Amino acid sequence: DPIPLDEVKTVGRALGASINDVLLSCVGGALASYLRDKGDDTDGVTLRALVPVNLRPMERAYKLGNQFGLVFLELPIGMENPVARLYAVRENLRSLRGSYQPVLALGILAAMGAGPKLLQDTLLAILARNASAVMTNVPEPQQPLWLAAARIAGLLLWVPQSGDDGVG
C-alpha cells in the first residue's frame, strides 16, 4: 500500500530528516526484509544505490531541463532499527551532497552526451558496475493533468536501468 506523503513529512520533521531520507530508509528496510525472506543474511550489509542530486540553483528552478549529478549512496540495509537506518541514510546523503561526486557526475554526463557512442557506452558501463540500484522520487502532480482534452487517470513512472542494475 502507498505511504501517505503527509505521514512521510511528519516522520521527517520529527526526526530532522528530508522526505528523500525517509523514503530511501524505508526502501532500504523493505529490501532487507525481502532479502531476509529469501534466506540472505543482511547483517551489516550495505547496498550501493545511484541517487540523483539536484544541482540547479533556486533562482533557476523555473527553467526547463535537467541539472543533476549522481552520487553512490551506501544504503545500510543491514540496520534493522529503522530510526538508526534513517539517521545513517541522512548522514550519508548530507556528506555526499557536499562532496565533489554530484558535480563530477554532472560533468561526466555532459561529456557522455557530447561524445561518441563508444564513450557513452563505456562510461555508462562503469557507472552501472558500481551500483546495485538506481533510486529517485518524482512528486506526483498537485492538480489533474489533461492530454488532448482527456483527463489522465494515472501515471506510471520508472527509472532508466542500465547494465545489471536490479532495482530502480
Where are these regions (language model features)?
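Glycine-rich, charged/polar anion/phosphate-binding loops
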Residues: 36-37, 55-58, 117-122, 154-155, ...
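A structural signal for short secondary-structure junctions
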Residues: 42-45, 65, 125-129, 160-165
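Solvent-exposed, non-transmembrane amphipathic alpha-helical segments
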Residues: 43, 47, 51, 55, ...
